[in-house]
Amino acid sequence: KNGALVSNHSYGFLGGFEYGNYSGFSAWHWFGEDEDTEYVGFGHYGDTDSAWDLISYNAPYFLPIKAAGNPRGDGPKEGDTHYVQVKEDGKEVWVKSTKVRQKNGGEFGYDCINTGSVGKNILVVAAANKILDGYEKPEDVVAASFSAFGPTDDGRIKPDITGIGVDV
């Protein structure tokens, strides 16, 4: 067999804080359980990850390439209003909340790669800033402020590789 097959999957699932109009209001929205203060999907090896690994196992010359995601540091200021989905009369509705929740990636920016991008047999790509004056030393390579970092909940290091992802 010659070469490898690759596929690009530069999308992911909503998790933790996302800014948008999901409730009908442009604001921060919490994509987690109301009682949670930290999003449990970050770093979690879920059904989608298992499916990617099964595909990779059954197609050994195929490499799925996934985006690490861009949620790092996202979230409102502590105590600011955001929206969260709760069940009312058997249906999901968006309600205002001022509950203090951890920004995506917490204080240090780690553990914010969402489920669906933590498979064991996929290549996960993070974003880095451009190096404007040429590479001279490792410190010249700087991850984009928004790009997701691991580790996964089972201790694996993700992302696997970083490429230029700012002002491309």
Language-model features: where?
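Loop-rich non-cytosolic ectodomains and luminal regions
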Residues: 1-168
